[in-house]
């Protein structure tokens, strides 16, 4: 079965750049014919273009297991943790931008506190330490490479 890694986020906002940074770390380091990486610092995948990206993927790659990577907001005590769930991910939920869910495995790096308010969450994502993003992206990238033996 093909494994499709979708790294969600935008390089325009530090707190939302975790996915693209992981994609950047993985993109040229995966040398297996059945593993595909989508989303990096140059080609962002967000709630705005996810439908088009999925349509393209589904036309090109059959029988896929989807692994999604994104930054997330949560309780203050979870900041810096990586949450792995064998379930779908909802894209753009911190900013109430989407209720579209998909995927088989979700990897979320907790980058800030969920304030339960769209404007406060937007500000939270824009005030994340780049060091936290770098550390989480390194941790996630290394684990993926180890698990997939690439």
Per-range role (PLM):
Residues 1-66, 71-150:
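N-terminal catalytic or cofactor-binding beta/alpha core of small enzyme domains
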């Amino acid at each position: 079965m093909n494994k499709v890694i979708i790294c969600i986020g935008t390089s325009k906002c530090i707190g939302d750049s975790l996915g693209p940074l992981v994609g950047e770390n993985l993109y040229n380091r995966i040398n297996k014919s059945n593993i595909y990486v989508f989303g990096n610092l140059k080609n962002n995948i967000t709630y705005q273009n996810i439908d088009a990206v999925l349509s393209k993927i589904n036309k090109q790659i059959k029988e896929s297991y989807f692994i999604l990577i994104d930054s997330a907001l949560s309780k203050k005590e979870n900041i810096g943790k990586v949450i792995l769930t064998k379930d779908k991910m909802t894209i753009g939920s911190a900013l109430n931008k989407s209720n579209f869910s998909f995927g088989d495995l979700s990897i979320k790096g907790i980058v800030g506190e969920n304030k339960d308010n769209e404007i406060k969450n937007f500000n939270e994502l824009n005030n994340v330490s780049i060091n936290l993003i770098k550390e989480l992206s390194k941790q996630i990238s290394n684990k993926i490479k180890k698990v997939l033996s690439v």
